[in-house]
UniProtKB/Swiss-Prot annotation:
It is a peripheral membrane protein. GO terms for biological process: plant-type hypersensitive response. This is Putative late blight resistance protein homolog R1B-8. Residues 345-368, 437-459 form a coiled coil. This protein is encoded by the haplotype B genome of the allohexaploid Solanum demissum. Gene3D superfamilies: Helical domain of apoptotic protease-activating factors, P-loop containing nucleotide triphosphate hydrolases, Ribonuclease Inhibitor, Winged helix-like DNA-binding domain superfamily/Winged helix DNA-binding domain. It comes from Solanum demissum (Wild potato). GO terms for molecular function: ADP binding; ATP binding. LRR repeats lie at residues 865-889, 908-936, 1011-1036, 1040-1059, 1060-1084, 1086-1111, 1128-1151. Confers resistance to late blight (Phytophthora infestans) races carrying the avirulence gene Avr1. Resistance proteins guard the plant against pathogens that contain an appropriate avirulence protein via an indirect interaction with this avirulence protein. That triggers a defense system including the hypersensitive response, which restricts the pathogen growth. Belongs to the disease resistance NB-LRR family. It comes from the Eukaryota. Residues 426-741 form the NB-ARC domain.
Length: 1202
C-alpha cells in the first residue's frame, strides 16, 4: 500500500503544471482524473483498515517506538492537533475534506483528548524525578494513544469519490464508543502507568516551586476521567475538582500561595483514587470508590472540606473586590437586574425555587428606598452598612438570604434618622431627563480680550502671525479660542479653518489627519481616500503613509490659501518646533492661535506681538458668570441669595472652571438661602487652592444613577472628542442605565448625559443641527483627571500603563473595568485582572491600527476574561478569531483579519452591540455573515461594513426575526429582493445604512416598505456608474435621508416624497439629475423638511413652487457649480435661518444675497445668517487635476469634475 501511494504521488507531481504558467486543458483534465483516483484509493484503504482495526484490541507490547522522548511525543501530538484544526476550519462543502457539522462535535472531543494528553506529558517531563523507565513507559503509552486518536479521526473522515460513501454513522459511533470507553484505562497496562506517574508526581510536591498542579491544567485530567467513567459515587469529590477547575485559573494566585501544596496533594490523590478504582474494578465489578479510598489511606472527604472552604473564601474575596464601590444603591440595582434575568432565563429549571426567589426579589426592592438615604449620607458607619448589603448576601445560600436581608433592612431603618440637610441637592430626576442645556458656552469678563484677538486675526499684516494665549487650567483658554473659531465674521475671512489638540501624549499622524480633515472636509471623497492611503488600504503592500508624507499633503493643501489654525494644549518648545514647519507662510495674512499653560512656550511661539496672558476674573465678573449659569437670561432677584452667591463666587478663587462647576451644583437645588448656605459651608475656605475639592463636591451631590456614568469618562484619553452614540452604547452595556417602562434606554441615557452637561461636568463639542441632540462631547482635563483617580479609588476602573510593575498590579484589588493603551500591557497583566467585567483599549493614534503580530496572543488572552461584558478594542486591535466563549459579552468592538464570521457567533447570546471591521472588506470583497446571527435575539446594534448573508436560501427558510435590532450598517445588496428579505427580519429598525451595487428589480419604481419605526436611512451606490434607484422609499416616520451617487429625476423624487411626509433632513451627495439637470419641486413635497443639503450635484435649473418647504431652516449648497441661481421663493420662507454656499458660481451668490436682504429687511429676521466660503479656482483646478491622477488608485470622481 505504501509503494502504491508513493507511485501515485510521483505521477501526480509529474503532471502538476508550473505554478507560474496557466494550466493547459489537458493537464487540468489529467489532474481531475488523478484526484478522483486518489479519492477512490483512500476509500478502499479505509475499508481495509476498518476490517482489521479495533481500538481495544491493540496492546502496548505490540507497538515498539524507538524515540520516546517527551519532545518527540509532544511534537507528534502538535502535528495531530494542527491537522485536526485545519480540518475543522474547512467550511466549503465542495471540498473533499469537508467535515459535516454533525461530525465536528465528535472531532472536537478527540481534539480535547489530545490536548489533555499533551499537557500530561509536558507536566510529567518537567516535574517527575522518578526513574527513567517509568517515564519511558508513560511516554510510549501516550504516543500510541495519540496515534489511536488520529486513527479514529482518519477513519471517521468522509471521502466523496465514485459515489462511495464514508463510514456509516453506526460504524463511526462504534469506533468512538470503543475509544471513549477505553480512553481512561486505555492500553493495558495503562492504569498502572498512570498510577506510577501520579505517585511520582506526588513525591515531588515539596520540591515543585515553579508551577503547582492546582494552578495548572493537571486539574482537568481527573475531573475529565470522572465525567466519563463515574456515575454517582463520591459526588463530593467531583464537586471539589469541578470547583478547582472552573475557578482557580481566575483567582489571584497570590491569595492561594499558602495552600498550593495542600491543593496539589488533594488533586493528585483524586487521580490516584480514580485510576486505582478502574484498575481494581476491572477485576471486581462490585468495587466501590469509598473502599479504594480507605484502602489507599487517603481520607479524601476530610481533606477536601478545608480546601473547599479556602477556595470559597478566595472566590468571595475576589467577587467582593470586583464590585465597584461607587454607590451602594448600585449594588441592589445590579443584583435585582441579574436576578430578574436569571429567573426569566431558567424559569423551567428553577420552578422549585420560584417562591424563594420571588421573596428575595421583593426584599431587594424594599431595600432600595432605605439604601438611597444611606447612599446620600457620607457617614462612614452608614457607608459600611451600605456595602455590607452586597457582601453579606454573597456569603449566604438562598435559604438564609431572606432572613439576612430582613436583618440588614432593620439595621438601615434604625439609622433612618439621618438629618435631611442634603436632600435639597438630590436631583429631580423626572425634570432632569427632559432638560437641555443652552448650546452656546457663556463667556463673561473677556470682552476686551476677544476684541483684541479679533483685531490681531483680521489686521492687515501680510505675513503669518502666531497668536499665543497662556494661563492656568480652568481659565477658559479653549472656550475663548472656540468663540473666535466659530465667529462667522472671523471665519468668513479665511479659506481654510482647521484645529488640533496636542496634549502631553500625542501622535504626529493623529494631529496631521485632524488638520487635513478640517482643511478638505471630513465627509469629502478626498478625505476618505486619504484615510485609506494613510492606513495602507489603498496599497497592494498595505504600506501606510508616514508622517512626513502626510505633512507634505497638509503643506500643499494650505499653500497659497489663507488659513486659520487652532493649536491647543502645547506643552513644550520642542513640540512647536516640530509643528511649525507644517504651516507655510505665503504672505497672505494666515493666522495661528496657539494655547498653552506655560508662559515660556507662549513667548517662544509668538511672532508679531507679545503672548496674551489670560487673567483671573474679578469679583464682579465671577458673580456674573455664576448668575448666568444658574439663572440663565434672568437675574437673581433675592438680595439675600445674591449675598450668599457673591460669597460662593469669591470662594471659587476667581477661576471660571470652579465657578461653572459650583453653578452646576446650585442649578440643581432649590433657590433658597438655606440651601446655598449649605453649599458654601461644604466648600470651605480652602476651596480656591484645590480645584479637585470642587469637583469632588460636584461628584458628591450627583444622583446615584449618574455617578457611574460620570466616572466612566475616566476610560477615555485626554483631549479626545467622544462620540455620543458610542458612549451611550457602552453605558447601556455596562448596565448603568435604569430601565423605565415604555421608554427606550437610549432616550434615558441621553437624559443622563444632558443632566451631566447641565451640571457643567461635560462639555458639548457638537450638536445635531436638526434636533439639537448632542453628537459629541469632551471633558476638561481637570475633570478627566478626577474621574481617573476617583475611579481607581472606588475599584471602578484601572488603567494599565506600560511602566506599571506586575507587583503593583497584583497588589490591586480586582476592578470592574480595565483600560489600556498598549497591547503588551494586556498580555502581560491579564492573569491578575481576569475577573474584570470590561476591557477597553484606547489608542493615542485613532486613525491607525497597530500591527497584527499580536493578534493570535490577544485573541487567546481574551479567553481568560470569563466574565467579560464589554470588550471595546476601538477597531484598533486586530484579533485572530472572535472569542465566542465569552458568553456574558454585551458589547464587542474589534478589528478582524478575515472576511467571514463564524457560525458560533450565536454563542454570544447576550450580545447587544456588535461592531466589527475587516481589514480587507470592500465592495469587491464582502464580509459573510452566518445565518446563525438571526438567533441572537438580544442584538440591538450591528455595525459591519460591506456585509452580506452567507446563505440566502437558509435565510429564506429561517423565519426568525431580530425584534430588538435598532441600528444596522452596512449590509450590501445587489438585488431588491435581498433588501426586502432583510427588512422583514428587522421590523423595529430605527437607523439603516446600506451599500448597494447594480440593484436589480423586476419593477421600476417598485415601492419598498421600510420598517415603520425607521428614522434614519443612508443609501450609497457603490457601482462605478451612476444608477437609478429601482424602488420608491416608503418609510412613514423617516426623518433623515441621505442618497449618494445615484441618478435621480423630478418624477422619482416626487413619488418618493409622497411616502416621506415626516422627513426633516434631506442630503443629496454626488447625484446626477436627469431632465437636463433640472429638478422641479411641486407643492406638497417634503412639508416637514428643516434641512436641505446638496453636495456636488449636477443641478443646473431648480424650479420650486411658492409654497414648498414651509418649515425649512437651513439650506447648504456645496460644489453646485452648474446651478444658475437659488429660487426666489426662498425669500418668503419665514422659518429660514441659515444659508451656506461653498464652491459656488457668482449668480448663486447674488441670489443668496437677495434672499438675505429680503429676510432681514422685509421680514425682520435678524437671526438669519448667510455664509459664503471663499474658493480659489486656480488652486481648486490644480487640486482636481491631482485628484484625476489618482484614479488609478481607485478614486471614482463625479462626472462634473471631468
Amino acid at each position: 500500500m505504501i509503494e502504491f501511494w508513493r507511485s501515485e504521488y510521483t505521477r501526480i507531481l509529474s503532471i502538476c503544471p508550473d505554478p507560474g504558467k496557466k494550466y493547459r486543458n489537458k493537464n487540468v483534465r489529467m489532474w481531475s482524473l488523478y484526484l478522483e483516483r486518489v479519492r477512490e484509493v483512500i476509500w478502499k484503504t479505509k475499508q481495509e483498515f476498518k476490517a482489521e482495526y479495533s481500538f481495544p484490541k491493540t496492546s502496548l507490547a505490540a507497538n515498539k517506538v524507538d524515540d520516546v522522548s517527551p519532545k518527540f511525543v509532544m511534537e507528534v501530538m502538535d502535528v495531530f492537533v494542527e491537522n485536526l484544526n485545519v480540518l475543522m476550519k474547512i467550511n466549503d462543502p465542495c471540498l473533499w475534506l469537508f467535515v459535516p457539522g454533525h461530525m465536528k462535535e465528535q472531532i472536537e472531543q478527540v481534539l480535547k483528548e489530545l490536548k489533555l494528553l499533551r499537557f500530561f506529558v509536558c507536566f510529567v517531563s518537567s516535574k517527575c524525578i522518578e526513574p527513567q523507565y517509568r517515564r519511558t513507559t508513560f511516554y510510549t503509552h501516550a504516543l500510541i494513544e495519540a496515534s489511536h486518536n488520529a486513527m479514529v479521526v482518519w477513519l471517521h473522515l468522509p471521502v466523496y469519490g465514485n459515489k462511495n460513501q464514508d463510514l456509516a454513522p453506526t460504524e463511526v459511533s462504534r469506533l468512538l464508543s470503543d475509544f471513549m470507553e477505553m480512553k481512561i484505562k486505555s492500553i493495558q497496562p495503562g492504569n498502572s502507568i498512570y498510577i506510577d506517574v501520579l505517585q511520582a508526581l506526588k513525591s515531588t510536591i515539596p520540591q515543585a516551586q515553579q508551577k503547582h498542579a492546582a494552578e495548572s491544567g493537571i486539574v482537568e485530567i481527573p475531573i475529565h476521567s470522572l465525567t466519563v467513567g463515574l456515575s454517582d459515587q463520591m459526588a463530593n469529590l467531583q464537586e471539589m475538582i469541578c470547583l478547582l477547575r472552573d475557578n482557580l485559573i481566575h483567582l489571584p494566585i497570590l491569595d492561594l500561595e499558602f495552600h498550593l501544596q495542600d491543593m496539589d496533594s488533594v488533586i493528585l490523590d483524586a487521580g490516584l483514587l480514580i485510576y486505582s478504582f478502574y484498575d481494581i474494578k476491572g477485576e471486581k465489578e462490585d468495587t466501590m470508590l469509598e473502599d479504594i479510598n480507605r484502602a489507599l489511606g487517603f481520607d479524601l472527604p476530610r481533606n477536601i472540606e478545608p480546601i473547599k472552604a479556602m477556595v470559597y473564601l478566595v472566590m468571595q474575596k475576589a467577587f467582593q473586590c470586583n464590585l465597584p464601590r461607587v454607590h451602594g444603591l448600585g449594588y441592589v440595582d445590579f443584583l435585582l437586574k441579574n436576578l430578574k434575568d436569571f429567573q426569566g432565563r431558567y424559569s423551567d429549571s428553577l420552578a422549585f425555587l420560584k417562591n424563594q426567589l420571588q421573596v428575595i426579589q421583593t426584599e431587594f426592592e424594599s431595600l432600595q428606598p432605605f439604601l438611597k438615604v444611606v447612599a446620600e449620607e457620607p457617614h462612614n458607619k452608614l457607608k459600611t452598612l451600605n456595602e455590607d448589603c452586597a457582601t453579606q448576601i454573597i456569603r449566604k445560600s438562598y435559604e438564609d438570604i431572606i432572613e439576612e436581608i430582613t436583618c440588614i433592612k432593620a439595621k438601615i431603618q434604625e439609622k433612618n434618622t439621618v438629618e435631611d440637610t442634603m436632600k435639597t441637592v438630590i436631583a429631580r430626576t423626572s425634570s432632569q431627563l427632559a432638560r437641555t442645556l443652552r448650546m452656546n458656552e457663556e463667556i463673561v469678563g473677556f470682552e476686551d480680550v476677544i476684541e483684541k484677538l479679533r483685531n490681531r486675526l483680521l489686521n492687515r499684516t501680510k505675513g503669518q502671525d502666531v497668536i499665543s494665549i497662556h494661563g492656568m487650567p480652568g481659565l477658559g483658554k479653549t472656550t475663548l479660542a472656540n468663540r473666535l473659531y466659530s465667529d462667522m465674521s472671523v471665519v468668513s475671512q479665511f479659506d481654510i479653518c482647521a484645529r488640533c489638540c496636542v496634549s502631553q501624549v500625542y501622535s504626529y499622524k493623529d494631529l496631521l489627519l485632524s488638520l487635513i480633515r478640517d482643511a478638505i472636509g471630513e465627509n469629502s471623497d478626498q478625505h476618505r481616500e486619504l484615510i485609506r492611503d494613510a492606513i495602507g488600504e489603498n496599497s497592494d503592500q498595505h504600506r501606510e503613509l508616514c508622517a512626513n508624507e502626510l505633512a507634505d499633503k497638509l503643506r500643499k493643501t494650505l499653500l497659497r490659501r489663507r488659513y486659520l489654525i487652532l493649536v491647543d494644549d502645547v506643552w513644550e518648545n520642542s513640540v512647536w518646533d516640530d509643528l511649525r514647519g507644517w504651516f507655510p507662510d505665503a504672505n497672505n495674512r494666515s493666522r495661528i492661535i496657539l494655547m498653552t499653560r506655560h508662559h515660556e512656550v507662549a513667548k517662544y511661539a509668538s511672532v508679531h506681538g507679545d503672548p496674551l496672558h489670560l487673567r483671573m476674573l474679578d469679583e464682579d465678573e465671577s458673580w456674573k458668570l455664576l448668575e448666568k449659569k444658574v439663572f440663565g437670561e434672568q437675574s437673581c432677584s433675592s438680595p439675600l441669595l445674591k449675598n450668599v452667591g457673591l460669597r460662593i463666587a469669591k470662594m471659587c478663587g476667581q477661576l471660571p472652571l470652579s465657578i461653572v462647576l459650583v453653578a452646576g451644583i446650585l442649578s440643581e437645588m432649590e433657590k433658597e438661602v438655606e440651601c446655598w448656605e449649605q453649599v458654601a459651608n461644604n466648600l470651605g475656605s480652602h476651596i480656591h487652592n484645590d480645584s479637585r475639592a470642587i469637583v469632588d463636591q460636584s461628584y458628591h451631590v450627583l444622583p446615584c444613577h449618574l455617578k457611574s456614568c460620570f466616572l466612566y469618562f475616566g476610560a477615555f484619553l485626554e483631549d479626545r472628542v467622544i462620540d455620543i452614540s458610542r458612549l451611550i452604547g457602552l453605558w447601556i452595556s455596562e448596565s448603568f442605565i435604569k430601565s423605565c417602562e415604555g421608554r427606550r434606554l437610549e432616550y434615558i441615557a441621553e437624559g443622563y448625559l444632558e443632566n451631566l452637561i447641565g451640571r457643567n461636568l461635560v462639555m458639548v463639542t457638537q450638536r445635531a443641527i436638526s434636533d439639537g441632540k448632542v453628537k459629541a462631547c469632551r471633558l476638561h482635563d481637570v475633570l478627566l483627571d478626577f474621574c481617573k483617580k476617583r475611579a481607581a479609588e472606588e475599584n471602578f476602573l484601572l488603567w494599565i500603563n506600560r511602566d506599571q510593575s506586575t507587583k503593583a498590579v497584583y497588589s490591586h484589588k480586582q476592578h470592574a473595568h480595565l483600560a489600556f493603551t498598549e497591547m503588551d500591557n494586556l498580555v502581560e497583566w491579564s492573569a491578575s485582572c481576569s475577573l474584570v467585567g470590561s476591557v477597553l483599549f484606547k489608542s493615542y493614534d485613532p486613525y491607525f491600527r497597530p500591527l497584527s503580530s499580536h493578534a493570535f496572543a490577544i485573541s487567546h488572552i481574551l479567553l481568560n476574561f470569563k466574565f467579560l461584558k464589554v470588550l471595546d478594542l476601538e477597531h484598533q486591535v486586530i484579533i485572530d478569531f472572535i472569542p465566542t466563549e465569552l458568553f456574558y459579552l454585551r458589547y464587542l468592538s474589534a478589528h478582524i483579519d478575515q472576511n467571514s464570521i463564524p457560525s458560533s457567533i450565536s454563542n454570544l447570546w447576550n450580545l447587544e452591540t456588535l461592531i466589527l471591521k475587516s481589514r480587507s472588506a470592500s465592495k469587491h470583497n464582502r464580509v459573510l455573515l452566518p445565518s446563525t446571527v438571526w438567533d441572537m435575539v438580544k442584538l440591538r446594534h450591528l455595525h459591519i461594513p460591506y456585509f452580506s448573508t452567507e446563505d440566502e436560501e437558509a435565510l429564506l427558510e429561517n423565519s426568525a426575526k431580530l425584534y430588538d435590532l435598532e441600528t444596522l450598517s452596512s449590509p450590501y445588496f445587489s438585488r431588491v429582493e435581498d433588501a426586502e428579505l432583510m427588512l422583514r427580519r428587522t421590523p423595529n429598525l430605527r437607523k439603516l445604512i446600506c451599500e448597494v451595487q447594480c440593484l436589480e428589480s423586476p419593477h421600476q419604481y417598485h415601492v419598498l416598505n421600510f420598517p415603520i419605526r425607521l428614522e434614519i436611512l443612508k443609501l450609497y451606490n457603490r457601482s462605478k456608474a451612476f444608477k437609478t434607484i429601482p424602488f420608491c422609499i416608503s418609510a412613514p416616520n423617516l426623518k433623515y435621508l441621505k442618497l449618494s451617487r445615484f441618478y435621480l429625476d423630478s418624477q422619482y423624487l416626487s413619488e418618493t416624497a409622497d411616502h416621506l411626509k415626516h422627513l426633516e433632513v434631506l442630503k443629496l451627495s454626488c447625484v446626477e439629475f436627469g431632465d437636463h439637470g433640472e429638478w422641479e419641486v411641486s407643492n406638497g413635497m417634503f412639508p416637514q423638511l428643516k434641512i436641505l443639503k446638496l453636495e456636488y450635484v449636477s443641478l443646473m435649473k431648480w424650479i420650486v413652487a411658492d409654497d414648498v418647504f414651509p418649515n425649512l431652516e437651513q439650506l447648504v449648497l456645496r460644489g453646485c457649480r452648474h446651478l444658475m441661481e437659488i429660487p426666489s421663493c426662498f425669500m418668503d420662507i419665514l422659518s429660514l435661518k441659515y444659508i451656506k454656499v461653498d464652491e459656488y458660481s457668482e449668480s448663486v451668490v447674488q441670489s443668496a444675497r437677495k434672499i438675505q436682504e429680503t429676510q432681514i429687511e422685509e421680514y425682520q429676521n435678524n437671526n438669519f445668517k448667510l455664509v459664503i466660503i471663499k474658493v480659489h479656482y486656480r488652486e481648486k483646478l490644480n487640486e482636481l487635476f491631482s485628484l484625476l491622477s489618482l484614479t488609478v488608485l481607485g478614486l471614482v470622481l463625479h462626472p462634473i469634475f471631468l
